[in-house]
Swiss-Prot record:
Organism the protein comes from: Thermoanaerobacter pseudethanolicus (strain ATCC 33223 / 39E)
Keyword field: Nucleotidyltransferase, RNA-binding, rRNA processing, Transferase, tRNA processing, tRNA-binding
Name of the protein in question: Ribonuclease PH
Domain of life: Bacteria
PANTHER family: EXOSOME COMPLEX COMPONENT, EXOSOME COMPLEX COMPONENT RRP41
Length: 261
């Protein structure tokens, strides 16, 4: 199958991540995956939701939205409709769950980190790009807490990223564009850690059922893509990468690599 943009079946779209995109947020990025572009910010609050009060644990939560003209035709802001759509709620929860899976909330303490993802241009994979970009914004925000002396170490147990896979015209493809996604027999979003652990799988037989072998093949394809994405995350976070996934405070105090940003 010849893909629209000439990619191989297992080839990611070009990825560009601009760190510190917003000067006010404790962590921020602009992530570009092909023609999909998302601004992700991480903001720290010195309080937690009521269900976390008194536990000593922090919380990571997310909001997600799209610029009205992020798509080919204008879509009104959801605030004008009075409530977020079911899709928006689903994506917000997915982003929050994905990030919490690699955060030690005990080390964070009773703080909330708000992850805000705003899609400024959508060409497929907005939720997966949001997760991948938000992880970097979150890491920078957590590092600022360490630098201020508020927490002893970056409470990240590892890296997390996401990618879409699917079956289009009988072909298993990695990182679907909007047009590919629209024509997919099977559409799947996969979230994984740098250890190859699965955080979440969202898979649907849009055009019909699929087999266990299809599922296995798509997961392998997603794992291959996520490994590449996490390598990019580590390059972007080169100045603090040695502080991520560290068990002891002593090891966390080792000299970081020099920044490339």
């Amino acid at each position: 199958m010849n893909r629209i943009d000439g990619r191989e079946f297992n080839e990611l779209r070009p990825i560009k991540i601009t760190r510190n995109f917003n000067k006010f947020a404790e962590g921020s990025v602009l992530i570009e995956m092909g023609n999909t572009k998302v601004i992700c910010t991480a903001s720290i609050e010195d309080k937690v939701p009521p269900f976390q009060k008194g536990t000593g644990k922090g919380w990571i939560t997310s909001e997600y939205g799209m610029l009205p003209r992020a798509t080919e035709t204008r879509n009104p802001r959801e605030v004008t409709k009075g409530r977020p759509s079911g899709r928006t709620m689903e994506i917000q929860r997915l982003i929050g769950r994905s990030l919490r899976s690699v955060v030690d909330l005990d080390v964070l303490g009773e703080k909330t980190i708000w992850i805000d993802c705003d899609v400024i241009q959508a060409d497929g994979g907005t939720r997966t790009a949001s997760i991948t970009g938000s992880f970097i914004a979150l890491a920078d925000a957590l590092n600022k807490l360490v630098e201020k002396g508020d927490i002893p170490k970056i409470p990240l147990k590892g890296f997390v990223a996401a990618v879409s896979v699917g079956i289009v015209e009988g072909n298993e493809l990695l990182d679907l564009s909007f047009q590919e996604d629209s024509n997919a027999l099977v559409d799947m979003n996969v979230v994984m850690t740098d250890k190859g652990e699965i955080v979440e799988i969202q898979g649907t037989g849009e055009g019909g059922p699929f087999t266990k072998q299809n599922l296995t093949d798509l997961l392998s394809l997603a794992e291959y893509g996520i490994e590449q994405i996490i390598k990019i995350q580590k390059e972007v976070l080169s100045d603090i990468v040695d502080k991520i996934g560290v068990d002891s405070v002593e090891n966390n105090n080792s000299n970081p690599q020099s920044s490339q940003n």
